[in-house]
Amino acid sequence: MKEYKAIITDFDLTIADTAFLIEDCLYTNAARFGYDLDRGILRDGIGMTAESIYLDAGCSAAEAKRLHDEYIPYSAEIMREQTELYPGVADGLASLHAKGILLAVLSLKASDQIWRPLERAGVDKYIHSVISPDEVEKHKPEPDGIFYLSEKTGIALEDILYVGDSVTDMKTALNAGVDFAAVCTGAVTADQFAEMGAEIIHPTFADLCRAICAEID
């Protein structure tokens, strides 16, 4: 594995154990308005916008937009205060930072829903940037978030690694022209990532961090 100057990571299901929180918020938000949606479909959509997930769950475009607009404030406090990082992530981020690698998070979430869990875990000091919808207009799988960090830091795209757990994450890296590392803490398996052409695949973010640091050592 080559040495990278910057690593950008997805948040949900990559470094943060949020599968149940997101699924439950999507479901209970819709239930407030009389919808009984398939939890499996909601869970499989994690990584996309709430509007896209509600569309996949069978809502009309107007219904999906309404539920999306209600979901944002409904879920905000829950995500800020109940999100926890996966085991080993804190140590992994510390190790990467100690190696001089610039670290950033790219997510569809508002930045405070990311910074607060990072602060609670004591790892916010390792993160250079959180790239949220506040920073870029076009979201994953569009490459704008990765371009934003490259332009902000002056780090070339060939020196950036993007890490994620989903097909959307892989498409984002491909669209940006950066290397991609898959972690299998989401819905996509290692075999599925390999079939799609992923070359760097690890069970967890912590495993990936250990592999990167071992290469530098």
Which residues are covered by each model-predicted region?
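Conserved Lys-Pro-Asp/Glu-containing loop-to-beta segment of HAD-superfamily phosphomonoesterases
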Residues: A6, K140-M170
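Substrate-recognition/cap helix-loop segment adjacent to the acidic, metal-dependent catalytic center
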Residues: A30-F33, S52-A61, Q82, H97-A104, ...
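Short acidic capping loops at alpha-helix termini that bridge into adjacent secondary structure
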Residues: L37-I41, A62-E63, D124-S129, L157-L161
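Acidic, Mg2+-coordinating phosphoryl-transfer loop and its flanking beta/alpha structural elements
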Residues: L161-I200
